[in-house]
């Protein structure tokens, strides 16, 4: 993963935190993620298409978190300890194989917690501006796709 993809991947965690703040706990389950260069896509389980105002608020909150330049903590923990400490919120809809006994857990305090083995920036400020480019709601699967670029 190169430097720009590290920033874009970190932006996924920032956008996810903003999505949950704006749309609520019903949007907390990530179905898939995609990163290519400065382009990212976050897909979460959700039951409706967000309003334009909600999308604007997600982008605003994400960029506010970038400007706050808060630290990104990565903890490498035995799986049982990670589960005790962070609970189900650190997981996504795609399972981590049971034979994985040590987890890396990425934490942006009061924003996002996620078991993730990718590279991340040390702070949110290193990411740069996040611009939401496209939002697609797939009603039949109840999936919300948010595509963004890191500028």
Predicted segments with their positions:
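Active-/binding-site microenvironments in catalytic and ligand-binding cores
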Residues: 1-151
